[in-house]
Swiss-Prot record:
Signal peptide: none annotated. This is Uncharacterized protein C03F11.2. Gene3D superfamilies: Ribonuclease Z/Hydroxyacylglutathione hydrolase-like (3.60.15.10). Pfam families: Lactamase_B (PF00753). InterPro entries: MBLAC1 (IPR039344), Metallo-B-lactamas (IPR001279), RibonucZ/Hydroxyglut_hydro (IPR036866). CDD domains: MBLAC1-like_MBL-fold.
Length: 362
């Protein structure tokens, strides 16, 4: 069976977060994921957190590509006592980073997790919801495929309503990012059902008061929405007045398996420069109904040509690998390295391969 699903990456104040990864057997989607990460000039070893929205095989399977990350998943997925419980074990919301929360949103499975990304100036609050929503069409249906395949459709409906009433945009499990419309909010009966929940939960810092006026903002074209963000009340688009400009971008391609099967890689960058309409050459298809594109990555003007690598480990690579290893608080001396995972050696090997590929291409 060929399974594909959305893979997301969030950058928040020095933290790289990957949400879901392709199936272990989906080689094409794995390559797309790694290409998407590389497009941000980072390597998998720099990812600090990996969140699995639920335990179905099309949403996890490539976690081994992130050896330095902390992994978050439902407690039912792993029952080994060596795993550490988090706030989500006793609470509905866990603060992962300054602008990112993990929400308990059971429904599709008993252990669904939704990643709430706050203060994205182009889009307000973005919910990375896994299969709680399959796609935009599914979000408008009272009893669609989500209802038929849900672990508990009644609980699932409650979780979906929570997300609809709180977020401005949703990245679904199998489709393009879409905005939450006023029609969706009306169908979820937001004011009567969800405002009380927010008041009772002290962890949630935002409120649904923006709902009266958000529609006039999100109906604008994406470029207008972003460029006019400074003139809009930040209370209802979810951005503080001092926040940096942000961007959300999508990389979408059709897999070799089927003309109708797509895998989507989204990046929500909370510290990006003001987006332009330009994008890197890995954007293949239409960007209709998406927020503004991020800035194309430019080569640093102070870039220094390094000598070609010869031998197993070039001294410059070895030196840089040690600095990277130190930043990641990995062991430095040989005795510690022999006892623990050899992250330093992996960095040396990875950097050597990357540099040789660069030299061959240029």
């Amino acid at each position: 069976m060929n399974l594909t699903a959305s893979v997301s990456m969030v950058y928040d104040g020095g933290h790289y977060i990957v949400v879901d990864s392709p199936s272990a057997t989906d080689v094409h989607s794995k390559e797309l994921m790694l290409k998407g990460i590389a497009s941000r000039n980072i390597v998998p070893g720099e990812i600090q957190y990996v969140v699995t929205t639920h335990g179905h095989p099309d949403h996890f399977g490539q976690g081994n590509f992130f050896p330095n990350a902390r992994h978050f998943f439902g407690s039912y997925e792993y029952s080994d006592t060596n795993f550490i419980s988090t706030e989500l074990h006793t609470k509905d919301i866990m603060q992962l980073t300054k602008n990112v929360q993990l929400w308990n949103t059971p429904g599709h499975t008993a252990q669904d997790v939704t990643v709430m990304v706050h203060n994205v100036s182009c889009c307000g609050i973005i919910a990375v919801a896994g299969d709680l929503f399959y796609n935009e069409e599914d979000a408008n249906e009272a009893a669609g495929i989500w209802f038929q395949e849900a672990w508990n459709p009644i609980i699932g409906k409650i979780s979906r309503n929570k997300v609809i009433c709180y977020a401005d945009y949703v990245i679904p499990g199998h489709g393009k990012l879409f905005r939450i419309t006023q029609e969706m909010k009306n169908g979820a009966d937001c004011f009567t059902k969800y405002e009380t929940t927010l008041d009772d939960n002290k962890t949630v810092q935002s409120s649904p008061q923006f709902q009266n006026s958000i529609e006039q903002v999100i109906r604008k074209p994406a470029e207008t929405l972003f460029s006019s963000a400074n003139s809009v009340s930040f209370n209802y688009i979810g951005s503080p007045s001092t926040s940096a400009s942000s961007s959300t971008r999508a990389i979408e391609t059709t897999t070799a398996y089927s003309d109708s099967t797509t895998t989507t890689f989204y990046t929500v960058d909370l510290t990006a420069e003001t987006p332009s309409t330009l994008e890197s050459d890995i954007i293949f298809n239409s960007q209709e109904n998406l927020p503004p594109l991020g800035m194309k990555i430019k080569k640093n003007a102070n870039y220094i040509e390094l000598p070609d690598l010869s031998g197993d480990v070039h001294p410059m690579v070895q030196s840089f690998a040690k600095k990277v290893s130190d930043v990641l608080k990995q062991p430095q001396n040989e005795a510690e390295i022999s006892k623990m995972m050899p992250h330093l050696k992996k960095w040396q090997t990875t950097l050597t391969k990357l540099w040789k590929q660069y030299m061959n291409a240029n």
